[in-house]
Amino acid sequence: STEVATAKHVYECLKAGIDILWVGARTTANPFAVQEIADALKGVDIPVLVKNPVNPDLELWIGALERIHNAGLKRLGAIHRGFSSYDKKIYRNLPQWHIPIELRRRLPNLPIFCDPSHIGGKRELVAPLCQQAMDLNFDGLIVESHCNPDCAWSDASQQVTPDVLDYILNLLVIRTETQTTESLSQLRKQIDECDDRSEE
C-alpha cells in the first residue's frame, strides 16, 4: 500500500501493481486534489483508504469519501490519524475520538482504522492508543514499523520495531460485547435511580 496525492501518483501505483492506496490527511483537506484522485481511479477496482483531514472537519472527511465512492470505487475505508493542534503536550495529533465515532454512526458499514503512530507521535504511546482504538470498536490498526526506527527516513520517533509491534498486538484485548442503545438506556436508568436515592 502507498499514499497518493495526485493523479500521477495513482497512475504510477497502478502501473507498479500496488494493491491498496490511501489518501493522506493533507490531501483529504483539499477537495480539488481528492477529485483529481477520484477521476484517476474511475473504472479501477482497488481498495482506497482515506485519512481524516488535518483539521477536525467531519463533513470534509465524508466529502472525500463520497468523491471517491462516486467515482465507482466500492472498497473504501477510513483512517483516523488525529487532528493537528498547537497544543502538543501529549499527542502529536489530538485524537478527538468523537469525530470517528460520529463517522461510524453516519456510515455504519465503512471500515474505520486507527493510526496510533500519527496520533501519538511517540513510540511509547502506540500501545495504549492501539488498545483505546480497539476499545472503541475500530476495525483495525495502521501502525508504523521499522527494523531500526531511529534510522527511519520519516517519523522515526513514532515507529516501533516489528518485534515490539508483535508484542503490542499480542497484548491487545479485543472486546466482543458491544453495547446497544437499549442496554445503555438501561444503565442510564440505573444511574438515575442511584442519583435519586443519594439526593434523599
Regions found by a protein language model. Name each.
Residues 183, 190-193, 197:
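Charged, solvent-exposed faces of alpha-helical coiled-coils
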Residues 11, 38-40, 187:
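Short, flexible, solvent-exposed loop/turn segments with mixed acidic/basic and small polar residues
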Residues 3, 115-117, 195:
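Conserved acidic functional residues
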Residues 200:
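Conserved small/polar residues in nucleotide/adenosyl-binding loops
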Residues 18-19, 139, 195:
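Receiver (REC) domain switch/active-site residues of two-component response regulators
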Residues 29-167, 171-173, 179-180:
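Catalytic alpha/beta core domains of metabolic enzymes, predominantly
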Residues 119, 185-188:
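A short beta-alpha structural unit
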Residues 1-35:
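Active-site beta->alpha loop and helix N-cap motifs at the rims of alpha/beta catalytic domains
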